[in-house]
């Protein structure tokens, strides 16, 4: 007998052994079921149903948790997008503030020559346009003269005594502050009254 024929015979004998084992297992399982009483079979069926119901409840719970997590992720993403829209120009606005300050300082100087007066009026219009554009995009100017000092909005540069005003009243403003949609971009630099 060749090696190939021996191998085929061995494979067939293994297949026969496996088939016999499977058939024996099936017979013993069906025999065991037949040996169980109807009450025992009913009890086993109830146990199986209970296990399946528990599994189903667990899957439902996991599905609800996954749904809640997805909802939280969606809300967080919406909030992040909203904040990106609201505060996306913050850096740009911060960089423009010194320009606005410089224009404001230039406009404080008095001019007498007609050409200089006309130029000053043009600069005033340009400054107004710039401030209007910033306002349109959520940037608000803080000019707190006469208000109570708030360390969240103001930076105290100096304190002076003045009996005409209450303590912590803002007497003068060195540099205006700015907010972007309720968030401080730059605190106002102020002089406060301290008696």
Curated annotation (Swiss-Prot):
Q: Does the keyword Cytoplasm apply?
A: yes
Q: Which GO terms fall under molecular function for this chain's record?
A: adenyl-nucleotide exchange factor activity; protein homodimerization activity; protein-folding chaperone binding; unfolded protein binding
Where is it mostly found?
cytoplasm
Spell out the subcellular localization from the entry: Cytoplasm
Cross-referenced PROSITE patterns = GRPE
**Which family does the UniProt entry place this protein in?**
Belongs to the GrpE family.
Mind telling me what this protein is named? Protein GrpE
Q: Which organism is it from?
A: Francisella tularensis subsp. mediasiatica (strain FSC147)
Please name the taxonomic classification of the source. Answer: Bacteria, Pseudomonadati, Pseudomonadota, Gammaproteobacteria, Thiotrichales
What gene, per UniProt, encodes this protein?
Answer: grpE
């Amino acid at each position: 007998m060749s090696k190939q024929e021996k191998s085929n015979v061995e494979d067939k004998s293994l297949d026969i052994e496996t088939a016999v084992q499977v058939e024996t297992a099936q017979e013993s399982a069906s025999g065991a079921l037949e040996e169980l009483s109807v009450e025992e079979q009913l009890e086993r069926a109830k146990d199986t149903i209970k296990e399946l119901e528990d599994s189903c409840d667990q899957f439902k719970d996991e599905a609800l948790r996954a749904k809640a997590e997805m909802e939280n992720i969606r809300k967080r993403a919406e909030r992040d997008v909203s904040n990106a829209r609201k505060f996306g120009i913050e850096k740009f606005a911060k960089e423009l503030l010194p320009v606005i300050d410089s224009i404001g300082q230039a406009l404080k100087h008095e001019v007498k020559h007609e050409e200089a007066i006309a130029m000053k009026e043009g600069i005033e219009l340009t400054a107004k346009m710039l401030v209007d554009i910033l306002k349109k995009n959520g940037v608000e100017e803080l000019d707190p003269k006469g208000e109570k000092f708030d360390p969240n909005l103001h930076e105290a540069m100096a304190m002076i005594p003045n009996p005409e005003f209450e303590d912590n009243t803002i007497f003068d403003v060195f540099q205006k502050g700015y907010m972007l949609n309720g968030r401080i971009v730059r605190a106002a630099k102020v002089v406060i009254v301290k008696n």
